[in-house]
């Protein structure tokens, strides 16, 4: 059996500190790298007319002018290939079906649509279900429904992707107050304001 002395252990502990100091003392200049991705998202800048697959678009004004409770109401009435199932009895938690592929809040149902808000995937990590009531439909600036399977949109994008962008101070440079009432005592009040500072 080999016995390790205290000085050997001390040298083994202290030696990485000297290496780190030497590495930290050197300055390295790295060139910038630009990465481009060919998706139909307007934030990236590729025109929708140049995309080689079906893309349906809607603006926030079109969505808000449509009678209904949620964004699903607009989609079923205005976008081709979209149907809605009310499986949970909640108008804010609908199962959206696009060409046979679902985006549903129910765990266990097969999913095939990827949902993005401002480039952040809204499908839950393990079940891929979508909690539609967490998406603020009043804050949507524009929306694109992209058909077909595309690996650019991530795992489980079998039938398509729904990409939404929300308002910002640059796109919504005003203030607005909105009040809605409906059946069964439903009341909704919204106040929104946006703008960009000159500073």
Predicted regions and their residues:
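Periplasmic plug
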Residues: 88, 93-147
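A beta-strand signature from Gram-negative outer-membrane beta-barrel systems
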Residues: 122, 133-178
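Short, glycine-/polar-rich solvent-exposed loops and beta-turns at beta-strand/coil boundaries
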Residues: 26-28, 77, 81-95, 155-158
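Short, acidic, small-residue-rich periplasmic hinge/interaction motif at the N-terminus
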Residues: 24-64
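Non-catalytic regulatory/gating segments with a bias toward low-complexity or hydrophobic composition
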Residues: 55, 63, 75-76, 142-145, ...
């Amino acid at each position: 059996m080999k016995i390790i002395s205290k000085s050997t252990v001390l040298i083994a502990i202290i030696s990485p500190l000297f290496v780190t100091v030497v590495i930290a003392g050197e300055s390295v200049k790295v060139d910038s790298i630009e990465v481009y991705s060919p998706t139909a998202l307007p934030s990236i800048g590729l025109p929708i007319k140049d995309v080689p697959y079906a893309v349906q678009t809607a603006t926030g004004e079109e969505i808000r002018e449509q009678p209904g409770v949620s964004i699903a109401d607009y989609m079923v009435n205005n976008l081709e290939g979209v149907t809605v199932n009310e499986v949970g009895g909640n108008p804010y938690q609908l199962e959206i079906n696009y060409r046979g592929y679902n985006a549903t809040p129910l765990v266990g149902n097969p999913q095939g649509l990827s949902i993005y808000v401002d480039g952040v995937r809204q499908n839950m990590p393990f079940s891929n279900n979508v909690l539609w009531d967490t998406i603020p439909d009043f804050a949507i600036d524009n929306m694109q429904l992209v058909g077909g399977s595309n690996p650019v949109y991530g795992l489980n994008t079998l039938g398509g992707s729904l990409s939404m962008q929300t308002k910002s101070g640059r796109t919504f440079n005003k203030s607005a107050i909105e009040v809605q009432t409906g059946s069964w005592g439903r009341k909704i009040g919204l106040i929104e304001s946006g703008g960009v500072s000159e500073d």
